[in-house]
């Protein structure tokens, strides 16, 4: 959709983001546990990308709720069954944040509803956004962010769909929460303002990029960032820039972005990002 630029948009820059610095004595229990409900059979990659990216962005432990088989489970992720009972037990373990939707499928309405009614911070993506458009639940009190691409925006807004500026304000009005509208000219609602990502590159428009972004948001959020939405967008952008600079501007994949999260956070703390 068209951007619909407004003069009171704020540009995302290094000066406007915050990534929490971990103390040398920090342990995994202090860095926040994250639930990832996603990556069902045949879509395991989406859950893995989100979960591993959350770890690389600062999360201490990632509980991956998926019905996938054991051969598809990365050793860094703690696998649990995608049931309300298993999710309840995981939430009791110092959990602060949940990623809902990447590669999930549409057979988990009750589990999504349970998390929606919880006190966890939520990153809602992909099939989680489909649930939102179908069920139209009551607005939640706890913090959450939706991360739609253009097709998901159209499904959420239907006849109200227009330019990005109008879309982000309509989504907040209809559903509550905050929003990251992906694609060229990414818009972010955070701190009661609308933020614009000035960087755009067609290589970011490939499978899995949204899963990585959802993971980055959750990892930064769980580890203490007070601007997790725009910080995640900025960090993903910088990972892409670094890769494309080193590879003559081509061949970027979602896994490349995920692998560069750690180095880019390191550059941030060295004032080189």
Spans of model-derived segments:
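Small-residue (G/A/S/T)-rich helix-start motifs and N-terminal tracts that mark the onset
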Residues: 1-121, 130-145, 150, 154-273
């Amino acid at each position: 959709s068209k951007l619909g630029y407004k003069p009171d948009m704020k540009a995302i820059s290094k000066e406007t983001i915050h990534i929490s610095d971990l103390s040398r004595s920090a342990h995994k229990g202090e860095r926040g546990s994250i639930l990832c409900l996603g990556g069902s059979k045949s879509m395991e990659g989406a859950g893995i990308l989100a979960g591993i990216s959350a770890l690389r962005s600062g999360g201490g432990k990632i509980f991956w709720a998926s019905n996938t088989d054991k051969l598809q489970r990365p050793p860094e992720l703690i696998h649990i069954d995608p049931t309300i009972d298993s999710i309840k037990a995981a939430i009791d373990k110092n959990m602060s944040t949940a990623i809902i939707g990447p590669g999930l499928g549409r057979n988990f309405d009750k589990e999504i509803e349970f998390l929606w009614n919880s006190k966890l911070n939520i990153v809602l993506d992909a099939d989680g956004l489909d649930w939102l458009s179908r069920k139209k639940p009551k607005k939640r009190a706890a913090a959450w962010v939706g991360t739609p691409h253009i097709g998901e925006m159209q499904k959420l807004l239907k006849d109200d769909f227009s330019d990005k500026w109008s879309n982000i304000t309509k989504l907040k009005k209809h559903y509550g929460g905050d929003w990251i509208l992906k694609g060229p000219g990414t818009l972010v609602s955070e701190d009661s303002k609308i933020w614009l990502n000035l960087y755009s590159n067609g290589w970011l428009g490939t499978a899995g990029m949204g899963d990585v972004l959802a993971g980055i948001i959750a990892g930064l959020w769980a580890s203490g960032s007070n601007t997790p939405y725009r910080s995640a967008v900025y960090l993903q952008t910088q990972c892409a820039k670094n890769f494309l600079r080193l590879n003559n501007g081509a061949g970027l994949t979602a896994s490349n972005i995920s692998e560069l999260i750690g180095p880019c956070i390191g550059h941030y703390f060295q004032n080189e990002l």
